[in-house]
Amino acid sequence: MLMPKRTKYRKQMKGRNRGKAHRGNSIAFGDIAIKAIEHGRIDSRQIESARVAMTRHVKRAGKVWIRVFPDKPLTAKPLETRMGKGKGSVEKWVMNIKPGRIVYEMLGIEEGLAREALALAQSKLPFKTKIVTCESENEIY
């Protein structure tokens, strides 16, 4: 599971996920990628399950880049606990995703096979995405 080695503070406020992605919104390493087209929140389990689905489909050929990292702690109180008594403990690590963010990239795989693998990964993600290539990347999302 992906999570930071250490953080300055154990818990964070919820915050708001607004606007478009200005960083990480273009293909940097591969030639085909998954791009988010709506707001969402992805946790370390979802990142890993999508990665496993892709790499198994292409039989570990080529290279896959994960362009997101869950650095925000998400807290939860135990079930059947009364309100109060402070904030709950950290349950999982998440990352807020904005429209336009590149989530995964692939290189060195035939395009048809890469599209199939990325489609498998898309089904594991909790927000709408689209598959982009270096040529089609500049389209509006």
Curated annotation (Swiss-Prot):
This is Large ribosomal subunit protein uL16. Belongs to the universal ribosomal protein uL16 family. GO terms for cellular component: cytosolic large ribosomal subunit. Part of the 50S ribosomal subunit. It comes from Helicobacter acinonychis (strain Sheeba). It holds the Pfam family Ribosomal_L16. It comes from the Bacteria. The gene is rplP. Keywords: Ribonucleoprotein, Ribosomal protein, RNA-binding, rRNA-binding, tRNA-binding. Signal peptide: none annotated. Binds 23S rRNA and is also seen to make contacts with the A and possibly P site tRNAs. Residues 1-23 are annotated as: Disordered. GO terms for molecular function: rRNA binding; structural constituent of ribosome; tRNA binding. One of its GO terms (biological process) is translation. InterPro entries: Ribosomal_uL16 (IPR047873), Ribosomal_uL16_bact-type (IPR000114), Ribosomal_uL16_CS (IPR020798), Ribosomal_uL16_dom (IPR016180), Ribosomal_uL16_sf (IPR036920).
